[in-house]
Design a protein with these regions (language model features):
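Compositional signal for N-terminal targeting/processing segments
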Residues: 1-261
Length: 261
């Protein structure tokens, strides 16, 4: 949350609601998560016990799906959910190695999008924002431009103007995708992943979020350290200096990768 663009969304909603007539429906922002307890996390391999100690209200995407169902779908309303790419999967199941699985594969269909799509197939659609994909190369993974650069070549013919387009039953959606998403799938195409796509700029021109100076400070650093997420996924963050460095570097490192594509 230490980035200006997140705060700007709240400010925009506030300004809009102040401009509406008193009896007009207000623009709502729904928080799709609860407060996790990372201070309860036990280092070591993840298992049901140490994960449950962190996610005390249950599986996160189940929690999120229930909020959207109760607050939006059951009321016959619509919402735009901004979530991480994998959480938005609907029809697509993210593959993983399974020793006893057919072709040694199995598929996770329990992301937020998949949970909602199963119950409301005609009302749930997913749209991907232009981003880098990952591809396996030997024993490591590298970032690639979508469709190995074909998508950006086509966008360049349109002057790189921002545009949204269908992937479902469309020529672009029928293009083969060799990224990590194609693992365990035969003849995988981009349209199997998402229903639509929004192109903003070439990857080399995208910018990262803007860190808010002083968002984490001497007054709140102890609580921030106790609740800092996924401590087993990154270098230790032990003090305010480490925290500020992490917040600043996080978007920069992603954009450095994008700018090299």
């Amino acid at each position: 949350w230490g980035y200006q663009e997140y705060v700007d969304i709240y400010k925009a909603a506030w300004r809009l609601n102040r401009s509406l007539p008193p009896d007009a429906p207000k623009f709502r922002i729904l928080n799709l998560s609860y407060i996790f307890r990372w201070d309860n996390f036990t280092p070591g391999p993840r298992n049901p016990e140490n994960v449950a100690a962190v996610f005390t209200r249950g599986t996160v995407d189940k929690f999120r799906a229930e909020i959207i169902e109760q607050e939006v779908l059951q009321k016959g309303e619509k919402a735009l959910a901004l979530v991480g790419t994998t959480h938005a999967f609907t029809k697509y199941g993210s593959p993983y190695f399974k020793y006893n699985g057919d072709n040694f594969c199995d598929y996770d269909h329990d992301w937020l999008g998949g949970r909602l799509f199963r119950k409301y197939p005609g009302r749930v659609f997913n749209i991907m924002l232009h981003q880098a994909f990952n591809k396996r190369e030997g024993d490591s993974y590298i970032q690639i431009s979508p469709l190995e650069g074909l998508l950006e070549k086509i966008m360049a013919l349109n002057g790189n103007k921002p545009v949204g387009f269908d992937l479902l039953d469309s020529p672009m959606g029928r293009q083969p995708d060799p990224s990590i998403y194609s693992m365990c799938y035969k003849d995988f195409t981009l349209g199997q992943l998402f229903d639509g796509y929004i192109f903003l700029k070439p990857l080399s021109q995208l910018e990262g979020c803007t860190p808010i100076k002083g968002f984490v400070n001497e007054q709140n650093i102890e609580e921030a350290l106790r609740q800092f997420p996924d401590p087993d996924w990154h270098a230790p963050v032990k003090n305010l200096e480490d925290m500020v460095r992490f917040i600043d570097e996080n978007p920069r490192s992603m954009i450095r990768g994008y700018n090299s594509l």
